[in-house]
Amino acid sequence: MQDPERFATTRRGALKLVLAGLASAGLVKSATPALADTLGDIKARGELVAATEMQFPPFDMSDNGVYKGVDRELIDAVAKELGVKVSYLDLPWTSVLPGLEAKKFDLVIAPVTITKERLKRYAFTVPIADATAALMKRADDKSIAKPEDIAGKTVGGQKGTSQLAQLKEFAAKLPKPVEVKEYVDNNQSYADLAAGRIDASVNSLPNLAYAAAQRPDAFAVVLPAFGQPTYFSWVGRLDDQSLIDAVNAALVKLDGDGTMAKIQKEWFGQSINLPTTVPEPKI
């Protein structure tokens, strides 16, 4: 007895060949648009257009107009593997993912936390860094020794981030209400923290560790981190899997040849072991 599924597949394949022949002869028009070939387009023009928010040190920052950070060095190395150049776009964080969906650029290289909801909408690369949510306080504040000590206090964070969402969930379980202030970017939150207008800032542990290392007289990280273990990745569109596969292959190669560790040590002060596949998110 013939396998119905195999037979249907064979028939579909034959039909595609017939339609392809008719289309090449100009006898029929395509009923549906061709699948996206962003990787092919990138290689044809010799340029990858990548977007981020250059207000997220140590991953992305603008130093007197010069783009620097973990993502800059990583994407340059990836582009070299792909044989193309990179064009960088600096956008507000709240415009980055909508811009990707609107096809205004090829890839998001801003660190995006892998979450269950985002996995439904975007294609993620393998992780590039830890994204676990943590808190930072003023260095001289003795009233906060652990995350639970923010009960009854004011904490700031960047609007639209998973770290802010995790803060709200964490705060809801504390005995006293926490006032949560939302900011356009983390630098504004840090400025208000230093000025005493808020009591703590939320961000990923690597971001906070970097900020505290830059200003040890002003800031201190509150340990342990309170969030679920999570990771940052780059993001593409769901129909651009060939691009994501190529980027992943490059990232895995850079991890294997020591390039990833070198970049991590430069910006984080240490190398970090990361998964070489996209992990199942816990949030």
Predicted regions and their residues:
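N-terminal secretory signal peptides
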Residues: M1-L27
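Extracytoplasmic small-molecule ligand-binding "clamshell" domains
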Residues: D37-P111
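Acidic, polar ligand-binding/catalytic clefts
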Residues: K80, K85-D149
